[in-house]
Design a protein with these regions (language model features):
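N-terminal presequence-like segments and the immediate start of the first folded domain
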Residues: 1-166, 171-271
């Protein structure tokens, strides 16, 4: 829960009918007119395999870059077919004030956006992926978290400033030939990434979303307010066991060799 009016995020949804991928993509661009400042565009579609996923993700990035130029929002492509068939686009806009300064940056060939005012900084990352075509889910997760770490270090923001995290995982409940479940491998990579941070205000609010293709992809919102003008609180559900308190009995697959046991999903229900 964020108790500050000027960090509002507005969500907008658009959908096309069925057509060629290029036609649907241009239809989405024609439908969208920004009201505030877009910081993230997420496109949901149905590629047939990872090769097509990578090709289409590149097309999406190029079209959005042409549309927005140097002020392009961050971009994600989720391989999950909308119903009915077509493309769906979700846009996140931020409501800026006169005190806010927005910057469009790139590190390790990854575009990201910061919104900063005196004493407070926000960070938006989207579409952070690894080697979708060749690497294992675990290797991809490690690479994605390494990229996130590089950006957060460059921006002087602690890992604990992540407030919202979308985790997209290909065939999330599948196991590989060694018995490692995709989701458990991701959770172990996340636990190792989080272990250096102090989570005094709880873990990020997050969701693990299974996809048909696309390996591991992460979107992140981070918020770091040194002036304490923004209060961030974890929201729990007393009717549920917190995900980070799950027992070993509900965790599937083999444990990581770097760990003594399988690690729990590190997230809060909301924040």
């Amino acid at each position: 829960m964020i108790l500050e009016a000027n960090i509002e995020i507005v969500h907008r949804l658009y959908q096309t009918g069925k057509g060629s991928f290029k036609e649907m993509l241009f239809q989405l661009m024609a439908l969208y007119e920004a009201v505030y400042t877009p910081v993230r565009i997420v496109v949901f579609g149905a590629p047939q395999n990872n090769e097509e996923y990578c090709e289409r993700f590149s097309q999406i990035r190029n079209v959005i870059a042409e549309r927005f130029g140097n002020t392009a929002p961050t971009v994600s492509y989720v391989a999950q077919p909308p119903c009915p068939q077509g493309l769906v686009m979700e846009v996140h806009e931020v409501v800026l004030t006169d005190a806010d300064r927005i910057c469009y940056k790139t590190l390790d060939d990854v575009p990201y956006i910061t919104v900063e005012r005196e004493g407070c900084k926000r960070l938006f990352m989207s579409g952070i992926i690894g080697n979708v075509l060749q690497a294992t889910i675990r290797r991809q997760a490690d690479d994605v978290f390494r990229t996130i770490s590089h950006i957060m270090i460059a921006e002087q923001m602690p890992v604990s400033s992540i407030v919202r995290q979308w985790n997209y995982i290909e065939k999330i409940t599948d196991c590989d030939v060694t018995g490692h479940q995709h989701y458990q491998d991701f959770n172990d990579a996340r636990s190792l990434f989080y272990q250096s941070a102090q989570w005094l205000d709880g873990y990020p609010a997050a969701t693990g979303i299974g996809t048909q293709w696309g390996g591991v992809m992460i979107d992140i919102d981070a918020l770091f307010c040194q002036d304490k003008t923004v209060c961030v609180k974890a929201v729990d559900n007393p009717l549920q066991v917190s995900a980070h308190a799950y027992s070993q009995n509900v965790l599937l697959g083999e444990k990581d060799e770097k760990l003594n046991k399988k690690t729990t999903p590190k997230f809060e229900r909301a924040k």
